[in-house]
């Protein structure tokens, strides 16, 4: 295929868009791949659509290779299935809802678990029909509060979502493993630098869960890794390395002190270091108790207290993941006024336990550890309160912030922080959705068997931006050959009629060899053409310029930056095709 730039619907820009924040956003707009039409909404122009379709092709090839069958659901979905799973409520303001002219409720699909489950239930009824994997590549919609970074976080986006259906956990594990390997092949073919991290399932439900994160400084996801062992996890899924318990016998009794106006950790530590306690005190020696209200879906608000070492803050992403699907709100002054036993700035475990407030502790607060914490009276704290002797909790919770240098959960070394962009997520859903819809089939013994599911997503349109983030330089984009809009960008940089005719002939020969060619036949200066070639980012650039008269053309490697001369002759097209395929 030959596409002439004189006929291509394309306009490049020399300046960055004023509202573009990240390199991919700037370059994709400047190079004419996408255009904004509203907050979080983008049109795909010819070059951008070719990249998107090439990524879809790679995904389809690998999904088909593991036995996936492609289907397509509507994007406009009725309310009823999402009411059955309670996700009509759980999604809150994050989805687009609408009514038809008869007052019936719909949403623009953010995800399709319900539809996949109902479809399989309606079509199959025997164990002989399984295992089964279905997938779709479909536009999704989410009402992002703050769309940002171009197509990295948009309101309308393309996803591949697949679902495996099996009659037992062994089949689910096999499907999960097959998808995991397929995803690795997909991202390797796309030349994405990524890491696989342990993750949490969130509103999707399920048990085992892993994310594929593309390494990027502009990523919104924080993850950690241990260099020594290879352990990696999304920050929400990090399990705190729990210290060993300490002996309780022989520890001094807890003592209540008048500490004055010390409602913050900083003021409490300052008091402690002036009080003659016989040791230097840091924030890590204090225990702060954070109060909130939580509500399970369909339930009532109830109090929850979380105790964390005073040198740690609550990480709201980790907190939300730990409490999911419950929602939470930190107590405000009006709330504290309703519970006089909660003395703001001086809350301790005693009042919490006496008033039946659910109390969860950070895993570092193990039996035998001694703490300075609130004494439930204004201006008073207790020193030497020992966990397991003076107070207990209802359990532990992973809600405190994770830090660079924290010990890895596997004990192999320290954690290193990094940032990434989520490009894929795989879940072992189990029976959450098949339970909701009673998706049973007849087993080998003639008795009903409840199907078990896996869910596997890839952000297809997001991958365009991710690859642009990872593969660009100060001149422009640099697309991997697998998904580039064209294999060769052929630039006519010579006004001579013979050179122009030779370039057009060369394009035809390359086309005959199966090479897709973008032919710059515009009446523009060589400088303009070269700048556009660098900006557009085809992996190979062939220049028919002044050297044509001497029997040579230039072949430029956009990835490696090398340039070499090739001799004009009968084998020129073959030589170029061999070079770009090698």
Curated annotation (Swiss-Prot):
Q: Does the keyword ATP-binding apply?
A: yes
* EC number(s) per entry: 6.1.1.15
Instruction: Show the catalytic activity.
Output: tRNA(Pro) + L-proline + ATP = L-prolyl-tRNA(Pro) + AMP + diphosphate
Q: Name one GO molecular function term.
A: aminoacyl-tRNA deacylase activity
**Pfam families (alphabetical):** HGTP_anticodon (PF03129), tRNA-synt_2b (PF00587), tRNA_edit (PF04073)
Principal localization reads cytoplasm
The biological process GO terms on file are: prolyl-tRNA aminoacylation
Q: Which GO terms describe its cellular component?
A: cytosol
Summarize the protein's role. Answer: Catalyzes the attachment of proline to tRNA(Pro) in a two-step reaction: proline is first activated by ATP to form Pro-AMP and then transferred to the acceptor end of tRNA(Pro). As ProRS can inadvertently accommodate and process non-cognate amino acids such as alanine and cysteine, to avoid such errors it has two additional distinct editing activities against alanine. One activity is designated as 'pretransfer' editing and involves the tRNA(Pro)-independent hydrolysis of activated Ala-AMP.
Q: How does it assemble?
A: Homodimer.
Its domain comment says: Consists of three domains: the N-terminal catalytic domain, the editing domain and the C-terminal anticodon-binding domain.
Family statement: Belongs to the class-II aminoacyl-tRNA synthetase family. ProS type 1 subfamily.
* HAMAP family for this protein: Pro_tRNA_synth_type1
Name the record gives this protein: Proline--tRNA ligase
Gene this protein is translated from: proS
């Amino acid at each position: 295929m030959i596409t002439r730039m004189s006929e291509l619907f394309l306009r490049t820009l020399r300046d960055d868009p004023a509202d573009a924040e990240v390199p991919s956003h700037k370059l994709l707009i400047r190079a004419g791949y996408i255009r904004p039409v509203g907050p979080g909404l983008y049109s795909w122009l010819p070059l951008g659509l070719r990249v998107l379709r090439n990524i879809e092709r790679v995904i389809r090839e690998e999904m088909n290779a593991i036995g996936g069958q492609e289907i397509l659901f509507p994007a406009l979905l009725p309310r009823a299935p999402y009411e059955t799973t309670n996700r009509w409520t759980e999604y809150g303001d994050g989805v687009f809802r609408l009514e038809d002219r008869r007052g019936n409720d719909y949403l623009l699909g953010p995800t399709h678990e319900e539809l996949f489950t109902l479809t399989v239930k309606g079509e199959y009824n025997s164990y002989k029909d399984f295992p089964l994997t279905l997938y779709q590549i479909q536009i999704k919609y989410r009402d992002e509060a703050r769309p940002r970074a171009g197509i990295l976080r948009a309101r309308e986006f393309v996803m591949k979502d697949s679902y495996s259906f099996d009659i037992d956990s062994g089949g689910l594990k096999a499907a999960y493993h097959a998808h995991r390997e397929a995803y690795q092949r997909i991202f390797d073919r796309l030349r994405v630098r990524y890491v696989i991290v342990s993750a949490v399932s969130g509103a999707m439900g399920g048990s085992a869960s892993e994310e594929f994160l593309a390494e990027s400084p502009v990523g919104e996801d924080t993850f950690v890794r241990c260099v020594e062992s290879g352990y990696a996890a999304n920050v929400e899924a990090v399990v705190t390395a729990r210290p060993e318990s300490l002996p309780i016998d022989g520890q001094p009794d807890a003592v209540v002190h008048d500490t004055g106006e010390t409602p913050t950790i900083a003021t409490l530590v300052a008091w402690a270091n002036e009080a003659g306690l016989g040791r230097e005190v840091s924030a890590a020696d204090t225990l702060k108790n954070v109060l909130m209200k939580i509500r399970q879906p369909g339930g009532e608000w109830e109090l929850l207290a979380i105790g964390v070492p005073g040198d740690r803050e609550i990480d709201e992403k980790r907190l939300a993941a730990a409490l999911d699907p419950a929602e939470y709100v930190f107590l405000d002054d009006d709330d504290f006024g309703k519970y006089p036993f909660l003395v703001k700035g001086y809350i301790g475990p005693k009042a919490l336990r006496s008033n039946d407030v659910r109390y969860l502790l950070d895993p570092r607060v193990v039996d035998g550890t001694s703490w300075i914490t609130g004494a439930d009276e204004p201006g008073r704290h207790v020193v030497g309160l020992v966990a397991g002797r003076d107070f207990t909790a209802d359990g532990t919770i992973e809600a405190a912030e994770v830090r660079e240098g924290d010990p890895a959960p596997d004990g192999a070394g320290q954690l290193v922080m990094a940032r990434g962009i989520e490009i894929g997520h795989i879940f072992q859903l189990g029976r959450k959705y098949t339970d909701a819809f009673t998706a049973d089939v007849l087993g080998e013994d003639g008795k009903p068997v409840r199907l078990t599911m896996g869910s596997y997503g890839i952000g297809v349109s997001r991958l365009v931006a991710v690859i642009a983030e990872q593969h660009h330089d100060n001149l422009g984009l640099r697309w991997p050959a697998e998904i580039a809009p064209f294999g060769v960008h052929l630039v006519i940089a010579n006004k001579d009629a013979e050179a122009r005719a030779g370039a057009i002939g060369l394009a035809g020969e390359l086309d005959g060899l199966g090479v897709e060619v973008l032919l710059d036949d515009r009446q523009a200066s060589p400088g303009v053409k070269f700048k556009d070639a660098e900006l557009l980012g085809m992996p190979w650039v062939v220049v028919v310029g002044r050297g044509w008269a001497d029997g040579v053309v230039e072949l430029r490697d956009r990835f490696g930056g090398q340039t070499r001369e090739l001799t004009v002759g009968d084998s020129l097209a073959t030589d170029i095709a061999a070079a770009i395929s090698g």
